[in-house]
Amino acid sequence: MKKSLWLWGFTDSAETWNGRFAMIGFISVIFIEVVTGQGLLYLIGMMS
């Protein structure tokens, strides 16, 4: 039987990728706030 490269669930690989994407998202939000001078919620219209 061939072993699958991707396993479902809370595996070390899945948690590593989750952390990487979370860091990219966090840095992106900070970058947007610095460039525009406004928060993300204000930019998407949730705060007026």
Swiss-Prot record:
Keyword Chloroplast listed: yes
Record bears the keyword Oxidoreductase: no
UniProt keywords, alphabetically: Chlorophyll, Chloroplast, Chromophore, Plastid
GO cellular component labels: chloroplast
Gene name in the database record: ycf17
Localization (cell): Plastid, Chloroplast
GO MF, one annotated term: chlorophyll binding
Name the UniProt record assigns to this protein: Uncharacterized protein Ycf17
Protein family (similarity comment): Belongs to the ELIP/psbS family.
